[in-house]
């Protein structure tokens, strides 16, 4: 597993629990969407502008929705173009890139493309390489270049939401607390009179009958 402490120390932290899921397998995309919802996250809505851009990059029969299914025949260029388009979209706060063995591309090549895009953005990018030894090479490549990478969508999504909650907690710590307005005491004038009388007779602190007056008014 990717070192969570290193992930949280990164400046690639999400601004929201919304996530764009890019996959070459529609079924795996549905699994990722379900896991995201179960963990309290959301699929990022795709603007018309982003849909139009993706429509020019992807096969004509793509579903124009998130998860973004780039199809089983996706090559490295299609992966790269899709991730780049999502990172450039203002409504996207984070991207999960899923590679499955159905892909026509090499997992290491896909990993290299993701690494290049990750270095040019402050948005979080996470990778999932599913499959045997071949896919593991892609994961290792991502991890070696500080890109969080996992064997399953569920692991990646849990980490993404940890990252979001961590950022949110940091923001809350730095928020200026609102001023607490204390209600006026109903015995304010009594207290002022007792203090004034005490000072007039040369007393430097409340003693004796003055203390008793205050305690009686507060029911002590």
Language-model-detected regions and their locations in the chain:
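Flexible, active-site-proximal loop/turn residues at the rims of small-molecule/cofactor binding pockets
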Residues: 1, 101
């Amino acid at each position: 597993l990717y070192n969570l402490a290193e992930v949280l120390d990164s400046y690639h932290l999400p601004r929201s629990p919304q996530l764009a899921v890019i996959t070459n397998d529609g079924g795996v995309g549905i699994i990722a969407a379900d896991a995201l919802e179960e963990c309290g996250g959301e699929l990022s809505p795709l603007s018309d502008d982003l849909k139009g851009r993706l429509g020019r990059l992807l096969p004509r029969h793509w579903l124009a929705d998130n998860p973004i299914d780039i199809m089983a025949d996706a090559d490295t260029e299609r992966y790269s173009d899709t991730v780049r388009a999502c990172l450039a979209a203002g409504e996207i706060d984070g991207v999960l890139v899923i590679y499955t063995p159905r892909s026509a591309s090499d997992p290491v090549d896909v990993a290299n493309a993701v690494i290049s895009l990750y270095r040019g953005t402050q948005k979080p990018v996470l990778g999932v390489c599913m499959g045997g030894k071949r896919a593991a090479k892609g994961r290792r490549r991502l991890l070696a270049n500080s890109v969080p990478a996992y064997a399953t969508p569920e692991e990646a999504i849990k980490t993404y939401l940890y990252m979001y909650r961590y950022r949110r907690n940091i923001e809350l710590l730095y928020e200026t607390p609102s001023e607490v307005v204390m209600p006026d005491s109903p015995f304010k004038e009594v207290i002022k009179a007792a203090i004034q009388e005490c000072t007039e007779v040369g007393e430097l602190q409340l003693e004796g009958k003055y203390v008793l007056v205050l305690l009686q008014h507060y029911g002590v």
